[in-house]
Amino acid sequence: MAPSFGAINLEDIAAPKCFEIEERLKTECDIPVFHDDQHGTAVVTLAGLINAAKVVGKQLSSCKVVLIGAGAAGTAIAKLLRQYGIGTLYAVDSRGIISNDRTDLNAEKTALMDYLDTNVSGTLDDAITGADIFIGVSKPGLLTPEMIAKMNADPIVFALANPTPEIMPDLAKQAGVAVMATGRSDFPNQVNNAIAFPGIFRGALDNGIKKITDEHKLAAAIAIAGLVAEPTADEVIPAVFDERLVPTIAAVIV
């Protein structure tokens, strides 16, 4: 494929196959390979969190983050947040917190532990106590108002399950959430991987980049965040059709 195409964008491939396919393509091809369900989602999530933290007056480096869903998107989000310098990061799957005492983890989740804080075991309810940020890439209804009440003041919730998020925005705001994002276009702050990948590919193609690195993803997230000059609770992420996105992101993929 490499002689015929300038780059490969992978779409709608579930874990763990997506990890294997992406890694093999990166190894065998000398063109950029990017699974946007993983990395595009992670880039836009980080961009939104950078601005959400500004809205509530917190530093991401001091925040406790709880991530539910350790599949393709969750894995990429965890890795990028850690590389950015997030404070404390716990991941939760269907069996509880991913921790040192778990003996049921597959190879991908075991590798993911390198990016997590794994000294605490228990349930989502245990993990979310004292958290500043909740990120959901799992399924509807997992986050309750009672859980939000256990979070720190001015909690940030990115409930990204589609089409129905882990908690609906109106219910989350009634429970005290300060900044809310979803994966849907009919609510403010849509986390859509289409915000990121066109500009990343434009930059890679224009600049002859053969591998899209973690540094490129971090640069893209920071560039996206910078397009929101004065973040508010209802605007921490640019709109997906913002004409500034592609040239701004492309300029940092060098």
Regions found by a protein language model. Name each.
Residues 1-64:
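Glycine/serine-rich phosphate-binding loop and adjoining beta1-alpha1 elements at the start
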Residues 110-179, 184-186:
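Rossmann-like adenosine-cofactor binding region
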Residues 43-136:
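Glycine-rich phosphate/diphosphate-binding loop of Rossmann-like nucleotide-binding domains
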Residues 17-29, 36-39, 97-116, 217, ...:
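A cross-family phosphate/adenosyl-ligand binding-site feature
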Residues 1-2, 26-27, 56-60, 82-83, ...:
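Solvent-exposed alpha-helices and their adjacent loops that cap or buttress functional pockets
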Residues 9-12, 33-36, 91, 135-136, ...:
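General beta-strand structural signal in soluble alpha/beta enzymes
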Residues 36-37, 56-59, 159-161, 165-254:
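Adenosine-phosphate binding glycine-rich loop
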